[in-house]
Amino acid sequence: MALHAAVKGKLISVIGDEDTCVGFLLGGIGEINKNRHPNFMVVDKNTPVSEIEECFKRFVKRDDIDIILINQNVAELVRHVIDAHTAPVPSVLEIPSKDHPYDASKDSILRRAKGMFNPEDLVR
């Protein structure tokens, strides 16, 4: 019988408005790594775009994060950085916020995924 080492789970990170972050934190996703860096960032109207970019890049570099959730309206501010991220992990998912509904036409990840498939291949 082989012994299997326990694999430490990976994290979900969140970049979004206060309501989004609080909701996910209440759901239990909040973590602080050994360097005392949290896996979430609360963005408000006064948050500089450069700070959002740096946070996104930091989350991408962390090996303990597998999914980055980002409010779509925040993603629009750093679209060039998100579009430059082409690796499958961490996956980037754009989510709606309370004040901004989801718009599939603005989701670059969804557009990229649609480009991978030919619609005729999906029809039987």
Swiss-Prot record:
InterPro entries: ATPase_V1-cplx_f_g_su, ATPase_V1-cplx_fsu_euk, ATPase_V1_fsu_sf
GO molecular function: proton-transporting ATPase activity, rotational mechanism
SUPFAM superfamilies named in the record: AtpF-like
Pfam families, sorted: ATP-synt_F
Record keywords: Hydrogen ion transport, Ion transport, Transport
Disulfide-bond pairs as recorded: none
Subunit structure: V-ATPase is a heteromultimeric enzyme made up of two complexes: the ATP-hydrolytic V1 complex and the proton translocation V0 complex. The V1 complex consists of three catalytic AB heterodimers that form a heterohexamer, three peripheral stalks each consisting of EG heterodimers, one central rotor including subunits D and F, and the regulatory subunits C and H. The proton translocation complex V0 consists of the proton transport subunit a, a ring of proteolipid subunits c9c'', rotary subunit d, subunits e and f, and the accessory subunits VhaAC45 and ATP6AP2.
Protein name: V-type proton ATPase subunit F
Organism per entry: Manduca sexta (Tobacco hawkmoth)
Gene symbol of the encoding locus: VHA14
